[in-house]
């Protein structure tokens, strides 16, 4: 008889051939669990960045590379990126806060006619959303800080704009879905992050240097 053992790493099966149905169900269960973890750890709001970095790291390492354990990977990465993510949170909060300060009074004017200033602010918001859509996955993989992180983000946007746009659209779709149905928090964070990883990992591998980064992990280079 086939014995099944469930763990956060996945279903361990005594048979040599893994059942693809169980594998799929296990990954779906892990995505739901990660979505719940992300939601709980994001409740203080200021921890959203650290939670997102931890979510991305865990999705790639545990779900896609089948290494490490889910809880250990998530909370280790949450701690590792906590302070840096706070600084990033403040930058984006100030940026979008300033845009909102000038945009909200223009909403009534926009309803009665075209307001070039309002649409200019919307354009600036879209520009800000591009780096926001992948900055937390980036800090989960690379050790750039300050100006080096800004240069890296701009380089990726310049060379892989279509990928970044895809990530931004995924993020926007996920936010809209959660706003329309809060119960979607049970799966949206994990699913959006998983799909984003399919777009971002080929890009990140191009800039992962095993010979120059002492913190390089070998699974970074796996397909």
Language model region names:
Residues 3-121, 130-223:
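Helix-coil boundary and N-terminal low-complexity module in membrane systems
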């Amino acid at each position: 008889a086939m014995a099944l053992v469930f763990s956060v790493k996945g279903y361990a099966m005594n048979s040599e051939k893994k059942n693809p149905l169980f594998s799929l169900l296990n990954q779906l269960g892990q995505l739901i669990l990660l979505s719940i973890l992300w939601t709980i750890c994001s409740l203080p709001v200021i921890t959203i960045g650290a939670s997102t970095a931890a979510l991305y790291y865990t999705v790639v390492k545990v779900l896609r590379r089948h290494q490490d354990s889910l809880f250990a990977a998530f909370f280790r990465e949450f701690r590792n990126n906590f302070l840096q993510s706070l600084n990033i949170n403040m930058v984006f909060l100030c940026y979008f806060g300033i845009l909102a300060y000038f945009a909200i009074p223009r909403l009534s004017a926009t309803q009665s006619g075209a307001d070039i200033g309002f649409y200019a602010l919307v354009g600036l918001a879209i520009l800000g959303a591009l780096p926001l859509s992948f900055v937390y996955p980036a800090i989960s993989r690379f050790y750039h800080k300050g100006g080096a992180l800004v240069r890296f983000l701009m380089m990726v946007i310049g060379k892989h704009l279509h990928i970044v746009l895809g990530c931004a659209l995924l993020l926007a779709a996920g936010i809209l879905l959660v706003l329309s149905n809060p119960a979607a928090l049970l799966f949206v964070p994990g699913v959006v992050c998983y799909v984003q990883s399919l777009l971002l990992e080929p890009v990140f591998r191009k800039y992962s240097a095993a010979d120059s980064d002492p913190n390089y992990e070998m699974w970074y280079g796996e397909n």
